[in-house]
A protein has these predicted regions:
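Short beta-strand-to-loop acidic/aromatic patch adjacent to the donor-nucleotide binding site
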Residues: 79-90
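Active-site nucleotide-sugar/metal-binding loop of Leloir-type enzymes
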Residues: 69-81
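Short, acidic, metal-binding catalytic loop of nucleotide-sugar glycosyltransferases
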Residues: 19-31
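A short, glycine-/small-residue-rich helix N-cap motif at loop->alpha-helix starts
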Residues: 59-67, 146-149
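A conserved acidic beta->alpha catalytic loop
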Residues: 14, 35-48, 89-90
């Protein structure tokens, strides 16, 4: 079983999902990919997915954040890290998963790592989080949100807790319509963008009232892990 599970929520974009999964299969060495679709969306029926790719069908549609949180909390205990992407992403770098997991191990196994995506470097649009952080917080994506500002959330927590790492050697291209001209500004983008005003307000409210507590939770986890690591090293040295 892999240490890393990639979570890919999908909706009405069959060709995107096929392309993303194919690029994953061509480049990943150890990771697994879980494609999360909805019972009311037959777009993905009959697809012969590559090896290492599994599927999960949700009973009812939910926005991106509650959907990915529900699945993440169900599977987190079985992995060292979870990685969130969208179906407009294409994996480019061979062994990107080993590169990113190596970066996480360099941080002691606890932290947030994000790849070069050719769109933004200031925030982790596609984030990989160690599952001890997910379990400590009780969420994988900020639960006050519906779709947007998840990247800003992890940027705030990671920088303030000192556990955010950009991994430029792992390239996973984000072919968002704003930077990739061939990408159509389709109904899915338009539907998601309706959540924008709500999510901005919710993020700012979280930042004012809850962020400090969440950062403290992660700092305590890092401190406890650091103390345990030092104790183990001391015992090993006799």
């Amino acid at each position: 079983m892999s240490d890393l599970l990639v979570l890919l929520p999908v909706r009405h974009r069959r060709e995107n999902a096929i392309q993303c999964a194919a690029s994953f299969a061509a480049t990943a060495r150890d990771a697994e990919l879980l494609i999360i679709s909805d019972a009311d969306d037959p777009s993905y029926d009959g697809i012969d997915w590559p090896q290492g790719v599994r599927t999960r069908v949700m009973d009812e549609w939910m926005p991106y954040v509650p959907k990915i949180n529900k699945v993440a909390l169900e599977v987190a205990a079985g992995y060292k890290a979870l990685f969130a992407i969208g179906d407009d992403c294409v994996f480019q770098t061979p062994s990107w998963d080993r590169i990113m997991m190596g970066a996480l191990e360099d941080m002691g196994g606890t932290g947030i790592v994000y790849p070069e995506n050719h769109r933004r470097r200031d925030v982790p649009e596609q984030w990989m989080t160690s599952t001890d952080i997910t379990l400590a917080l009780g969420w994988f994506a900020n639960p006050v949100l519906k779709h947007y500002w998840t990247d800003n959330t992890w940027a705030e927590i990671g920088r303030r807790a000192g556990c955010l790492k950009f991994c430029p050697d792992a390239v996973i291209e984000h072919r968002h319509y704003s930077v990739h001209k061939p990408t159509e500004y389709d109904a899915i983008y338009q539907q998601c963008e309706q959540f924008g005003p709500h999510d901005e307000r919710a993020f700012q409210a979280w930042r004012a009232s809850q962020m400090h507590a969440d950062v403290t939770t992660v700092k305590k986890l890092l401190d406890a892990k650091g103390a345990g690591y030092k104790l183990t090293m001391k015992r090993d040295r006799g």
